[in-house]
Amino acid sequence: MQTFTMVLEEIWTSLFMWFFYALIPCLLTDEVAILPAPQNLSVLSTNMKHLLMWSPVIAPGETVYYSVEYQGEYESLYTSHIWIPSSWCSLTEGPECDVTDDITATVPYNLRVRATLGSQTSAWSILKHPFNRNSTILTRPGMEITKDGFHLVIELEDLGPQFEFLVAYWRREPGAEEHVKMVRSGGIPVHLETMEPGAAYCVKAQTFVKAIGRYSAFSQTECVEVQGEAIPLVLALFAFVGFMLILVVVPLFVWKMGRLLQYSCCPVVVLPDTLKITNSPQKLISCRREEVDACATAVMSPEELLRAWIS
């Protein structure tokens, strides 16, 4: 009987210890952790887009939600108990969170995530190593090279406002000089060079992020060629002749139009013969004086006047 009592005491002691040790992890967390915490936290960062990922918590037939919080350098050093909720990941369903808008400085960030199922909440899982955005992977930029007539045009993919592009271009020939141009944004066509007919031009580009002071690798070199030959001598001769004709015809046309306007506004009136002066004015004046004098000296008698009137 005594032995049986001792066995019962040992069983009760074992059950009590098992329950005690099972309760300790729950007491050490902020809330009762019934769900398992998310595991395998990592950050996939490409071209300044930061994605926190983790292994999903399995709950058959149930939807598990996740919450993400972060600490910047200041919080982790001076207020380690304060965590800031992520802008886009409060009770999200998927096992990932875009924390790009939360990572606003080039400093280490702590990230943590927990699962929620109804009233049950898991413990927090913390990213093993703090994340710094200067470790982002910069890919080679996509670009499209076109020719608009004799103009060399490039259009780079739009990677966001933080990206600039260093574009190198040159004429494909031995000893050609390489030119460099900084393009401030992508998504819009940019003129690089006026090309010569029959020549080929090559272009390559790389991205630059000023916030982290890093360049990507150069893209693959692409070349375009302008078909055709130089302007023929005959065409140049025709152009010269046409220019000379313009120099001659235009002044003549202006002069002719001026004459037409002059005649239309102030036409020339032809005088009748009776109004034309055939002798000099002085001679006419002298002739008129002689006639007056002759009339003044020739006085006829009344008989002569009557005879002249009858005849």
Curated annotation (Swiss-Prot):
MF term (GO), any: cytokine receptor activity
Organism domain of life: Eukaryota
Disulfide feature: 89-97, 202-223
Keyword Signal: yes
Signal peptide start-end: 1-29
Listed GO biological process terms: CD8-positive, alpha-beta T cell homeostasis; cytokine-mediated signaling pathway; homeostasis of number of cells within a tissue; immune response-inhibiting signal transduction; inflammatory response to antigenic stimulus; negative regulation of interleukin-2 production; negative regulation of T cell proliferation; negative regulation of type II interferon production
Membrane topology, as annotated: Single-pass type I membrane protein
Glycosylation sites: 40, 134
Domain Fibronectin type-III, residue spans: 37-136, 144-228
Membrane-spanning parts: 234-254
Any one cellular-component term (Gene Ontology): plasma membrane
Keyword Kinase included in the entry's annotation: no
Residues in compartment: Cytoplasmic: 255-311
Extracellular-facing ranges: 30-233
Swiss-Prot/TrEMBL keywords: Disulfide bond, Glycoprotein, Membrane, Receptor, Repeat, Signal, Transmembrane, Transmembrane helix
Stored Pfam families: Interfer-bind, Tissue_fac
Tissue: Widely expressed with highest levels in skin and testis. Highly expressed in psoriatic skin.
Function: The IL20RA/IL20RB dimer is a receptor for IL19, IL20 and IL24. The IL22RA1/IL20RB dimer is a receptor for IL20 and IL24.
Similarity remark: Belongs to the type II cytokine receptor family.
PANTHER family: INTERFERON/INTERLEUKIN RECEPTOR, INTERLEUKIN-20 RECEPTOR SUBUNIT BETA
Assembly information from the UniProt record: Heterodimer with IL20RA and heterodimer with IL22RA1.
UniProt protein name: Interleukin-20 receptor subunit beta
Organism of this sequence: Homo sapiens (Human)
Gene name of the record: IL20RB
